[in-house]
């Protein structure tokens, strides 16, 4: 082959390899969208501990909480889908307009704390243990970007205790205190921020129908008082969807795990302090995670049953529940069927 043809061929090969490498690199680059990927459900034993609880007997059964791995999807995945039972989630479906990933992480931490409080109340009360829920302050779970408080140093998850030295423990008390201050007036807030008590100064804003607002979405922060102490040891997991699992662990530990009859019970679902189970995201991926640990039963919110069954292998029985009591009954039925 003439020398110039060899050089031309080599140049063509190099160009093809370089182009292919560039395309491959581009496809593996992160997109702005997210991927939900299945994770094996995790045991609640060791995560939730009740004072005085005994070690579960062998073959007693176990409760598992289901989680979903969340990461940025690659460009390839936005075109061709997420492998191994994963799901592509558009950016706008996970983040609100103007919300950063750091904001979402803080909200997920707040939601996890709230789920633990609800689980403690529901689980202990189901055991007949007295529980008192004491209002503590007003937690910030949303901030209007254009409101003065957005540039005051306050962050999502902060808890407001005082408005101009007036103690506030509920959202109603916050509204009353702000009404006293008046609209578009300076106001001093004492709040729990980054583990410390801090004082900041901001301005109120006019709300609808003559109301006075801070420009935040408030949620009541509470203190749980009970003679039976419950502790949680968990890192790297956020969100509200483990509430049902945590309550079941508290109840099962209190019953010596006899209520499980040897079953592996995986669960997902938000939980209110009244025992209502609410919907969650990623039910299909969580069903796969339940199967990975050999779960006999997968309890999900009623609103997520179809999605969970679509993702669950035949080896896992999926049951929808509306309340914590429903969950206990579902476990009992599974042991007698």
Where are the regions that the model predicts?
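Hydrophobic membrane-insertion alpha-helices, especially the h-region
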Residues: 6-25
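PDZ-domain C-terminal substructure recognizer with occasional recognition of PDZ-binding tails
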Residues: 127, 175-218, 310-336
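Short, ordered loop/turn segments at secondary-structure junctions
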Residues: 164-166, 194, 271, 302-305, ...
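Glycine- and Gly-Pro-enriched alpha-helical subdomains that act as flexible
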Residues: 253-258, 265, 271-302
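Short, glycine/polar-rich helix-capping loops at beta-to-alpha or helix-loop-helix junctions
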Residues: 299-311
């Amino acid at each position: 082959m003439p020398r110039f043809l060899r050089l031309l061929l080599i140049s063509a090969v190099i160009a093809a390899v370089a182009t292919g490498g560039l395309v491959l690199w581009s496809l593996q680059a992160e997109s702005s969208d997210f991927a939900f990927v299945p994770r094996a459900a995790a045991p609640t034993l060791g995560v939730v501990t009740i004072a005085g609880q005994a070690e579960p007997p062998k073959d007693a059964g176990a409760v598992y909480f289901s989680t979903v791995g969340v990461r940025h999807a690659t460009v390839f995945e936005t075109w061709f889908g997420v492998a191994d039972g994963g799901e592509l989630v558009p950016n706008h479906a996970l983040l609100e307009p103007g919300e950063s990933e750091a904001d979402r992480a803080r909200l997920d931490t707040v939601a996890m704390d709230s789920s633990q409080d609800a689980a403690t109340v529901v689980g202990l009360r189901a055991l007949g243990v007295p529980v008192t829920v004491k209002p503590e302050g007003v937690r910030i779970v949303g901030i209007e970007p254009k409101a003065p408080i957005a540039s005051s140093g306050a962050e999502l998850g902060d808890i407001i205790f005082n408005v101009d030295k007036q103690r506030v423990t509920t959202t109603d008390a916050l509204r009353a205190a702000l009404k006293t201050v008046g609209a578009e007036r300076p106001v001093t807030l004492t709040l729990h921020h980054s583990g410390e008590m801090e004082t900041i100064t901001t301005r109120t804003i006019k709300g609808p129908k003559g109301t006075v607002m801070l420009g935040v979405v408030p949620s009541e922060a509470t203190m749980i008082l009970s003679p039976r102490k419950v502790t949680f040891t968990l890192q790297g997991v956020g969100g509200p969807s483990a509430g049902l699992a945590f309550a079941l662990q508290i109840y099962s530990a209190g019953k010596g795990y006899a209520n499980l009859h040897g079953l592996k019970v995986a669960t997902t679902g938000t939980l209110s302090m009244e025992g209502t189970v609410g919907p969650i995201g990623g039910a299909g991926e969580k069903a796969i995670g339940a199967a990975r640990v050999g779960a006999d039963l997968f309890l999900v919110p009623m609103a997520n049953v179809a999605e969970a069954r679509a993702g669950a292998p035949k080896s896992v029985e999926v049951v929808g529940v509306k309340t914590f009591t429903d969950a206990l009954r579902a476990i009992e039925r599974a042991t007698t069927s």
